[in-house]
Amino acid sequence: MVKVTAACIIIGDEVLNGKVVDTNSTFFAKYCFDHGIQLKEIATIGDDETQIVDTVRRLVKNYDFIISTGGIGPTHDDITYECMAKSFNLPCELDEECKERMRHKSDPEARLDADALKAHYQMATMPKGTNVKNYYVCDDLWVPICSISHKMYILPGIPQLFARMLKAFTPTLKKIYNLDKDPREYVRYFVRTHLTESQISKELKLIQDESTKVSEAIKIGSYPHFGMGFNTVSILGEKKDDSYLKSIVNRVVNNLEGEVISSELENKFSNQES
């Protein structure tokens, strides 16, 4: 069975100072779950060269598929490409293909002065090397997913672009990591109970300890819903263990006065929707 581990780097001072709410990591977490990828870490860091380089080098050593989002714009604090190049000991150069796509899509030379044009082409100045490959996954966009060593994938921080490009990249991603060959698929069940977390903690620990012996991928979680008068138990694991997972569901229902609910209903509860 193919096992792919992943990590996500959210880059931007605007996230750390509360100016922007990060939604890309949530999207990526769901994306990984849907494609049988084991997301192991999410790092949120600022526009700091040392921090970016250190984080990239650490994650690349430990995981298979690392994405970054943010910091590839035209301003002084957009340093992601430069830092990624440094992380892999590569030069950072103007990419002619990206530059030509910019010209074709928006004709910047006809509408920008020299200083603005230089800043604009900063967005096409990216890592260069034999281990670098740019994937132009959307025909109407000039920005690529920049890949280094089939490990690091650099995406824009704008949520709409991030989501669209990642979705479009899926067929290529499956080929790179052989995700269609004996794929790892995850399933998750939810059980609602009016018992408190203190009342269910002992039973959940017993279930988790027993489940780990079956598969380390099985995770039992408890999620309180403040002011709603109930909690939700999550049972997550691989599809190959579905029969065992369903036995856990029945155990939780019977032992913790629970009822099975859909993921859609659980999402409503999590978002405090009535």
Swiss-Prot record:
Disulfide bonds: none annotated. This is Uncharacterized protein YMR178W. GO terms for biological process: flavin-containing compound metabolic process. One of its GO terms (cellular component) is cytoplasm. One of its GO terms (molecular function) is FAD diphosphatase activity. The keyword Phosphoprotein applies. Keywords: Phosphoprotein. PANTHER family: MOLYBDOPTERIN BINDING DOMAIN PROTEIN (AFU_ORTHOLOGUE AFUA_5G11210). Present with 3890 molecules/cell in log phase SD medium. The modification Phosphoserine is found at residue 263. The keyword Glycoprotein does not apply.
